[in-house]
Each structure stands twice: as C-alpha cells, then as structure tokens.
Amino acid sequence: MSFRGLNASSGMGVADHSKNTFLELKRKKVHRYVIFKIDEKKKEVVVEKTGGPAESFDEFAAALPENDCRYAVYDFDFVTSENCQKSKIFFIAWSPDSSRIRAKMLYATSKERFRRELDGVHYEIQATDPTEMDLEVLRERAH
C-alpha cells in the first residue's frame, strides 16, 4: 500500500478494490450494495460482501453483523411522485450498541477518510440498530 493511503490522524487507508467496487455500484449498477470492514492487519478498509442488483433491502440488512461495526453503501431505487425512476446512493455507518467499544472507536475515527473516497454518495446514515436504517428511513431521506 502506498504511503499516501495511510494517514494516522485520519484513520485507516482505503483498498483500491474498495474504491473500484463502489464505482461498479455507482456507474455500472453491478451491485445493489457493498459492505466494507476494517482489516486491522492491513490497516485499510476492504470489501467484505457485495449484493447483486436483484437482492432486496432485507437481504442487505441481514448481511450486516449483529454485534460488529461496518460501513456500507446501498443503491436505493424508487419512483418519484411524478412517476420518474430514480436512484440514490446511501452511505451507512453501522455501529450497533452491542459492538465492542474498540470497534466503535476505530470505525468512528476512520469514517470521514473513507467517506471522502466515495464520490457520488447522496445521503449518509449513522445507525446503531436496524430501525435507524430501515427502508422507510431511506424512502423519507430520498424524497
């Protein structure tokens, strides 16, 4: 990894694969969602799981760990009141109450650095339990 990719004051570096996978979601619509985790050995944010374009929001939510932090992007498709098909990309910082304090701190201190790498995100959600990021929350934010 390049020296430029790591900056102690702003959290973990970001793996090129993570950036490229986000671009696949944004430009090519290859993924419905991408879940990222921090690899402490590599000191960077890496892709943990992707969901295909046909996967549902429930499948995405179920893929997030119950007791550990993650970052995720979700490509939310919806129809406006004018009957136009739209898509908005959500960045979700998942930090469940039951996760370890160390993990919460690590993800909190690395979030801004990682988030800046994801050009094209429309909305950001910080969630500590599933109700803070359910489909209704996304709908309200997107409209």
Curated annotation (Swiss-Prot):
One of its GO terms (biological process) is actin filament depolymerization. SMART domains: ADF (SM00102). GO terms for cellular component: actin cytoskeleton. GO terms for molecular function: actin binding. Residues 11-143 form the ADF-H domain. Keywords: Actin-binding. InterPro entries: ADF-H (IPR002108), ADF-H/Gelsolin-like_dom_sf (IPR029006), ADF/Cofilin (IPR017904). Pfam families: Cofilin_ADF. Belongs to the actin-binding proteins ADF family. Actin-depolymerizing protein. Severs actin filaments (F-actin) and binds to actin monomers. This is Actin-depolymerizing factor.
